[in-house]
Amino acid sequence: MTSLDSVLDKDGVRLTVDDAVATVTLTNPAKRNAQSPALWRALAEAGRALPGSVRIVVLRGEGKSFSAGLDRQAFAPEGFDGEPSFLDMARGSEADLDATIAEYQEAFIWWRRNDIVSIAAVQGHAIGAGFQLALACDLRIVAEDVQFAMRETSLGLVPDLTGTHPLVNLVGYARALEICATGRFVHAEEAERTGLANLVVPAD
């Protein structure tokens, strides 16, 4: 592939490739890169579209925030255009709900493939699904202004987008439980000290 080929650009996700390095960018800074089912499908597609020559994948978000997490439109009765609402999914069968969550999780699981090293470059807010997306990567380089938080419990949800397993592996069970149960912010100094962040760099 030639330098900086654009492989995919849809639904708030852009994938570019420069030889052995791919960059996946969340491209909706006006909404702080809030996440939706369409974005999750685009992330999963980005993983499938990676050329075999890629060895490093950098994940970043445009604007001041990496990702503010799930778009609040998910909790509106009408949900997202063309998507079943979360309320409708909750009323459906357990098997259907499990299948839908498994589909969403495809956006988060490919970052730990054994043929690549994935690096999340995280600035500003990384909340809920944004925190879980950063946790999906092998490494995290964070700006001094980073704010991680697992806010699902305050919404009556569980963090079911694969984030709890790597969180426990990084910081231990008790601290992971406390972070999830309280929904508090984890800032750069604590993130580096506890192993959530591999490196802290100045914010732009």
Question: Model features per residue range: what roles?
Answer:
Residues R32-N33, S65, L157, L199:
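Short strand->helix junction
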Residues L39, L43, Y104, I127, ...:
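Amphipathic coiled-coil/heptad-repeat helices and related helical stalk/stem segments
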Residues M1-E62:
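Conserved CoA-thioester-binding segment of acyl-CoA-metabolizing enzymes
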Residues V7, I109-D204:
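Crotonase-fold acyl-CoA enzyme core
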Residues P29, K64, D145-Q147:
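A short, glycine- and basic residue-enriched loop/turn
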Residues K31, S53, G61-E106:
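Glycine- (often His-adjacent) and acidic-residue-rich active-site loop
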Residues G12, G47, Q105-F108, F131:
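Short hydrophobic/charged patches on amphipathic alpha-helices used for structural packing
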Residues V24, N28, L43, L59, ...:
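Terminal peptide-recognition signature
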